[in-house]
Swiss-Prot record:
Residues 266-274 are annotated as: Catalytic loop. Belongs to the PI3/PI4-kinase family. Type II PI4K subfamily. This is Phosphatidylinositol 4-kinase gamma 1. One of its GO terms (molecular function) is ATP binding. It is an enzyme of class 2 (transferase).
Length: 561
């Protein structure tokens, strides 16, 4: 039986079992709060994976006289364990179950620490900032441990404690491409994809928390909501956020590492408020140039289900114009988008395949753009939609994906003998194949214009500038492991009319508002595995051609610092 996660039942008397259950790995995490040799508390353990399996084992024991016990609990009483499931269900003490990230030691340690604090009487404190329900969890001595965000208390959700919405889970949320209730799993995805803590995402878990006084709407009784699913992120001590200081205080390395993560995940909400500021040297003042490090938090609005308009606060910062260092280029070149996709499929089963495909596309885009010598600001600009003369136009990334997708369906039609003669049908395939909201899909003439939109000049980086990563092409041949769930195969995109014009200043953190009328963007959910592989090959070719053409600086931008 798998013993990665066990439940530690704390008892102070041989015949009494307390109401507390802690999910940890006693073999690797070295839980610091108890001494196994202590006579004050006796620890009993049992596997906490499947109570049905335990019940079946006990029935088998009584019927066949075949004693079945876990090797981790040789002294466990069969009589006591027979009622263990009922005892744990009947308890009113706080319990936490890890739903995602249980294989990561830092996640298990975080959950164990939070659980012990809560069973000792610590109460979650609702933070006044933000639009959603975020709770600060502390130890009995008042030390900050983590921040919990229940998914049903997200902005616009029906159980929001700040009365900012009444939407049910699964409806379009703050961004139409991310449904209500699905930000928590994206918080965990960002942590899992931040390999070796390169960007500094704090340890994050997806948990189920029961019998904890979170907010409950008047329309629901607590008895009907015994537990809540929430993201749990370790608290990071800080004095400011990036919005309280000028960008000149931050190191270029810190900005680059956050930007690399944002590009990979297509972060739709990287504003100054979710970048915490820490000093590199406590003796240095914050106002000195390049002395502060940034810690990224709040990744619930990343990995959208279709291409959307990202918001990168760092886009106009001077650090984003500095070329990538060799260390950063090596990190980017070693990224494997298909390995990342398989990781998310394995660890996060409920994350839609369409969101995983967005990760693959954005990672391929990042790798080729960095290899071509583009700086972070140039890459971010090519992923961001342009707003001029009262109209919003697609980004270069969206335009390339539109052309690649059109070529895929064009070839599919020819292979299926459904194609017709003449250029009229070809134009129809390119202009009417995709479902966009609030406007018509740009036709070939409009698409070609995007390749001539002025952009900052390329930054030469020696031999790297003329090489396109070969691992992307090689990985495409092995992309047969891409899977499409039954739900996604039957999903149908719904059109929403109208286009909402935005007049926000991109250098400031914009207020988030529901974007149900925005253009829906390019979606990859309607492609089969074969079509997806063909799309990636076409997309890589189009991207290589677009990057090789170069461009002139856009008005208001310069790569000189």
């Amino acid at each position: 039986m798998n013993c990665l996660a066990t439940t530690i039942i704390i008892t102070c008397k041989p015949t009494l079992i307390s109401d507390m259950a802690v999910a940890i790995d006693p073999f690797s995490d070295k839980f610091p709060y108890f001494n196994r040799s202590s006579q004050r508390c006796r620890l009993q353990s049992l596997t906490n994976l499947d109570f049905n399996f335990l019940a079946q084992s006990f029935n088998h024991t009584f019927e066949d006289d075949n004693i079945h016990r876990s090797v981790s609990s040789p002294c466990f009483s069969i009589a006591a364990s027979a009622n263990m499931e009922e005892d744990l269900k009947a308890t009113t003490a706080p319990r936490i179950e890890i739903l995602g990230g249980q294989r990561v030691p830092t996640v298990r340690a975080l959950v164990a620490e939070v659980t012990m604090a809560m069973v000792s009487g610590a109460q979650p404190l609702l933070l006044p900032s933000g639009m959603g329900g975020a709770y600060l969890l502390q130890t009995g001595k008042g030390h900050n441990i983590a921040v919990a965000k229940p998914v049903d208390e997200e902005p616009l959700a029906f159980n929001n404690p700040k009365k900012s919405g009444n939407l049910m889970l699964g409806q379009p949320g703050m961004k139409h491409s991310i449904p209500v209730g699905e930000t928590g799993i994206r918080e965990l995805a960002a942590y899992l994809l931040d390999y070796q803590g390169f960007s500094g995402v704090p340890p994050t878990a997806l948990v189920s928390i029961s019998h904890v006084p979170f907010h409950v709407s008047d329309a629901f009784s607590f008895s009907s909501m015994p537990y809540k699913v929430a993201s749990l992120q370790r608290f990071v001590g800080h004095d400011f956020d990036a919005g309280e200081l000028g960008p000149g205080s931050f190191t270029a390395t810190s900005v680059h590492r956050i930007g690399i993560l944002d590009v990979r995940l297509l972060n739709l909400d990287r504003h100054a408020g979710n970048m915490l500021v820490k000093r590199c040297d406590k003796k240095e003042a914050y106002n000195r140039l390049g002395t502060a490090e940034l810690v990224p938090i709040d990744h619930g609005l990343c990995l959208p289900e279709c291409l959307d308009d990202p918001y990168f606060e760092w886009l106009n910062w001077p650090q984003a114009l500095v070329p990538f260092s060799d260390t950063e280029l090596d990190y980017i070149s070693n990224l494997d988008p298909f390995k990342d996709a398989e990781l998310l499929r394995t660890e996060l089963h409920s994350l839609p395949e369409s969101a995983i495909r967005v990760l693959v596309v954005c990672t391929v885009f990042l790798k080729q753009a960095a290899a071509a010598g583009l700086c972070l600001a140039e890459i971010g600009e090519k992923m961001t939609r342009d707003f001029s003369k009262g109209e919003e136009s697609f980004s270069l990334l969206e335009t390339l994906c539109t052309k690649a997708k059109a070529s895929v369906f064009g070839k599919t039609s020819e292979d299926s003998d459904y194609s017709h003669e003449g250029n009229e049908v070809n134009t129809e395939l390119q202009c009417g194949m995709f479902k966009f909201d609030g406007g018509d899909t740009p036709c070939e003439a409009e698409i070609s214009e995007v390749f001539h939109v002025s952009k900052p000049p390329l930054v030469p980086r020696g031999p790297r500038a003329n090489t396109i990563p070969n691992d992307v092409t090689a990985s495409m041949s092995s992309s047969q492991n891409q899977r499409i769930t039954h739900q996604e195969k039957s999903a149908k995109e719904k059109k929403r009319g109208g286009k909402q014009e935005r007049c926000t200043v991109r250098s400031k953190s914009p207020p988030i508002s529901p974007n149900h009328d925005e253009s829906k963007g390019v979606s990859f959910v309607d492609m089969t595995t074969v079509e997806w592989d063909t799309f990636l090959q076409s997309f890589q070719t189009l991207l290589q051609d677009a990057l090789s053409k170069g461009s002139t600086p856009r008005l208001g931008c310069s790569c000189e610092i």
